[in-house]
Each structure stands twice: as C-alpha cells, then as structure tokens.
Amino acid sequence: MPKKKIIKKFDYPLELVENLILDIDNYKEFLPWCTNSKIISQDKTSTLIDIKADLEIGYSFAKDIYRSHVIYDINKKKIIVNALKGPLKTLENIWVLKKINDNECEVEFVINLELKNIILNKMLSKMFDYGFEKILKSFEDRAKFLSNSN
C-alpha cells in the first residue's frame, strides 16, 4: 500500500492555500486525472467544516467515481480526507497548514492509498511517486494562478 509524506513551503498566504484545498468543486480544473468534482454536502461550524464530495478520476481507459469525506479542523489547520465508497480500498490524506508569515505557509501532506483492484494497485505502486509529485505540483501551480488573479 503506497504511503508518502512531504513537507513543502508554499510562497503563498495560508488562507489562499487553505481555500484552494477546500475548493473541491474546482479540482476538475487543475488536478491531474480528475475529470469531474462535486461537493455533495457541506456543514460548517465555528471550528469544523465537514464535506462529502465525489471525484471522478480517469486515466487512459479507466475511469471511476469515489466519494470522500473531508473534515477540516479550522483551529488546527488540519484537513483529513477519507474515501467512503468507490474503487479505493484505502484513501487517507492529511493536510496540515502552518503560517510562516503573511505571504508563505508550510504544507505537510500525507497520503495513504490502496485500490480495490489488485492489478491496478500494482500499477499504481509503480507510478505512485510520480503521481504524488504531480498532484502536489498541481496544487502549487493553482495557488500561483489564483495569486496572480488577485
């Protein structure tokens, strides 16, 4: 089961990165292999944001939808994502955001991923590092795009 952790400095305000990660409806615009994304439900309190969302992931001939449960602890700046249904046997990713200053933040990203299909899971294992880096870069590129748009 592939698992990876990275800590990276983003040259963008924490609030921009935070909003970007939670803007699931727009993942289809920038996230590799994401062909559609939609928030199904969202509840917000003063300390938590609770989201259920569907993401359609496609690569070559394979395409599938998985539903995820996203919990954002506003005070801890921690986002936890788990798969609820779909082709993923295991999906857990954790984002922890730390403000460095008004224009920079540190992003800790951990992903633990396993597909239900054994053959596809073996293929995933071989390209996991590449995919992980590509996904993280897509968030960084999107942050740059949003920063330049303001």
List the model feature ranges, each with a label.
Residues 1-7, 50-52, 65-67, 78, ...:
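Intrinsic-disorder/low-complexity, polar/charged segments enriched in Ser/Thr/Lys/Arg/Asp/Glu/Gln
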Residues 6-8, 37-39, 66-72, 92-99:
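Hydrophobic/aromatic beta-strand elements that line small-molecule binding cavities or substrate pockets
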Residues 17-20, 27, 53, 70, ...:
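Hydrophobic pocket/interface hotspot
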Residues 39-84, 138-141:
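Glycine-rich portal/gate segments that line the openings of hydrophobic small-molecule binding cavities
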Residues 131-135:
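Membrane-proximal extracytoplasmic alpha-helices
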Residues 82-130:
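Beta-strand/loop substructures that line and gate deep hydrophobic ligand-binding cavities in soluble
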Residues 140-150:
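Short, highly charged C-terminal tails/helix-capping segments
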Residues 1-48:
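Hydrophobic ligand-binding cavity/cleft-lining segments
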